[in-house]
Each structure stands twice: as structure tokens, then as C-alpha cells.
């Protein structure tokens, strides 16, 4: 996404809250194909995935933490860590800002990373998906997004290759992800779920399906961590 001849990494712009106008973007930090970003709740750190398949000689991408200069929007690298899988395409944070989660598209895997008060990173979880679905582009898992539910107890991943929304239990103290039981919700074969969003009250969840340009709606039981399709 960002490896063309003109792009050098992550850019920032200032927003005028009265007029809605943005200033011309300026380089905030150089990076290797950064594709998705999240800012921690304390607004001190920005986390990015670098969507590569060649991190330090491994078929992997990386998670990078940056400290934010609030005065000019510039970023300084605090730490970098391998995602243990290729082409990480999404990253999100828990409510406390102590942990982030990543999804590897090519690797078909997900993981969790702990973030300390200095922005240092430590891999806390890694889970490899297995399986396939019906279309040629679904011959293997393709984890496309990963998000925590409003209760902070569960994390879900939309996997385009499996036609599933995979569900994990989350231990916020240890930063550990474990596969939940029942473990996943299916969408119609060939739909290809890409991203997932919870309603603010946590009672519903929605996935947009990339291949069929559709949306699937679910009821969410936050006690069990279970999704039930309703539309």
C-alpha cells in the first residue's frame, strides 16, 4: 500500500475543527509499508503494522510502536517486533492500552503484544488458523482484522479465507488469547469476511464481507463469547 516511489512511511496532517480542513500531510516517521495504525488511549503512543513478508530475513511483518510528539505530530520509534507471519494487515488496542492485537493476512494467524509504559513490546500470544473455504482465493486462512469486544473479555477475528469470525477469550492480566468455545461463527460460504465492528453496547456485531459486498449481523453473548447470526 505505501511502498510506491513517493511514500516514505507514516504521514500526519492537522485538522481544523471549525472548518474541517486538513493541512498538507507531512512525513511523521519513515516506515516499511505501514498499512494500519492505532493510537493508544493515553495518546502517547501510535502502533502500526508493517505489511511485509521479509522482516529480518523471516517471512513475517512487524508491529512498530512510536512515541507521539503532540506539538507537531512527529513520531519516534520506541520498539519493533515480529508478527511471526506474513502481511499483517490490521492492529487494534484493548481498552486499557496495555495490549494490542494483530492479524496476519498471508500468514493466516493472529497475535497479541503487550505494551509497557515506555512503548516497549513483547509478544504475549500467537495463534495459527487452519482450514479453507470454497473459492480459489480461500484455499488457506487469511486473518483480515482483529477487535476486542466492549466488555474487554473477548477478541474476534474476521478470517476471509475461512468464512468465519473466530472468537477468543482474552486474559487482560497476562495478555493471553485462547480459543473460545464455540470458537467461531460462520458466514455464508464464499462471503469472505473482512472487518468486524461491535455495537457500543456490545449486544451486536457486524462483519462486512469483501467478496460478496454484503454485511452479516450477529447477536453477541458477552458472557459466553458467542455470536449468533440474525441477518
Please place each PLM-identified region on the residue numbering.
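Short glycine/acidic-enriched loop and turn motifs that connect beta-strands
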Residues: 2-5, 51-57, 106-109, 162-164, ...
